[in-house]
Design a protein with these regions (language model features):
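Hydrophobic alpha-helical transmembrane segments
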Residues: 13-18, 79-84, 108-111, 139-144, ...
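Alpha-helical transmembrane segments in multi-pass membrane proteins
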Residues: 10-59, 84, 108-109, 220-231
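C-terminal membrane module of polytopic membrane proteins
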Residues: 200-248
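N-terminal membrane topogenic signal
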Residues: 1-19, 76-77, 191
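Membrane-interface helix/loop boundary segments of multi-pass membrane proteins
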Residues: 120-146, 187-191
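Aromatic-anchored segments of alpha-helical transmembrane domains
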Residues: 20-29, 87-96, 115, 147-155, ...
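Juxtamembrane helix-loop-helix connectors linking adjacent transmembrane helices
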Residues: 4, 32-43, 59-123, 130, ...
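Functionally important transmembrane alpha-helices
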Residues: 168-220
Length: 248
């Protein structure tokens, strides 16, 4: 923990970059090892829990939980459109039907891993990276946090997840839009908890998507709908944030 604190005090941005690198390497390694062991997400979950516990402990020891969004939202449900866009986003994963894509054990491991992923990615990209960069330039921080979150998903091409090029590129597009949306949610609420829950649920529902979602047209349709929903919600929240700042 002392080494983490030393790096954090020296440069919050490089601290964020170090976490991004560690996250990408360990989670990708976990996926590869899980495939070798023959149990989906078995090793990935262990790595995800380890990273989550280390990060939580670091934030708690240094009294940084609220500074990085682990606190109650300060926005009303009405100002967030009662999170209806998030519900619509979650429904996209199920629009082609519902089926069990893994065995019972693997489904449980997959769901738990996806909530670890949601937690880690929100804290790392929104809490750490965006939080560090916004001190210098808010607009640059929004752009970088959104783009790095989207582009970071291209690692699925080589981590053993089985994603093909087209599917992965489509994922990068809507992940960038989702990254923008989550940043705007964080800015409006001062909390990452709603982002973590929505992110984790969206990822977890992938374990139940219907067969049509894997077809070329299904992938394109899903990507377009997700990009439209997340972009529209992000733009609405951006205007809401600007309006509130102008009245303060």
């Amino acid at each position: 923990m002392k080494l983490l604190k030393k790096l954090y005090d020296k440069s919050k941005i490089w601290f964020s970059v170090a976490w991004i690198i560690a996250y990408c390497i360990l989670m990708s390694l976990g996926d590869g090892l899980s495939l070798l062991f023959g149990v989906e997400k078995s090793v990935t979950l262990v790595f995800g829990l380890f990273l989550s516990l280390v990060l939580i402990r670091f934030l708690k020891l240094n009294d940084l939980l609220c500074d990085f969004g682990l606190c109650k939202s300060s926005a009303s449900a009405g100002s967030m459109l009662f999170y209806i866009p998030l519900v619509l986003m979650l429904c996209v994963n199920l629009m082609f039907g519902i089926r069990l894509n893994y065995g019972i054990l693997e489904t449980i491991l997959y769901i738990l891993t996806m909530f670890c992923v949601g937690f880690l990615e929100e804290i790392i990209f929104r809490g750490l990276l965006f939080g560090a960069m916004k001190e210098n330039s808010f607009k640059s921080a929004v752009i970088v946090a959104s783009l790095t979150f989207g582009i970071g998903h291209i690692i699925n091409l080589v981590n053993g997840s089985g994603a093909d090029l087209i599917s992965n590129l489509l994922q990068v597009v809507y992940a960038t839009a989702a990254g923008f949306m989550f940043v705007m949610m964080y800015c409006n609420e001062g909390s990452l908890i709603p982002c973590i829950v929505a992110h984790g649920l969206f990822n977890a529902l992938s374990a139940f998507i219907g067969e049509g979602a894997s077809e070329p047209m299904g992938r394109i349709t899903s990507a377009v709908i997700l990009t439209v929903i997340t972009s529209a919600y992000a733009i609405y929240l951006a205007f809401t944030l600007k309006k509130r700042k102008n009245t303060e």
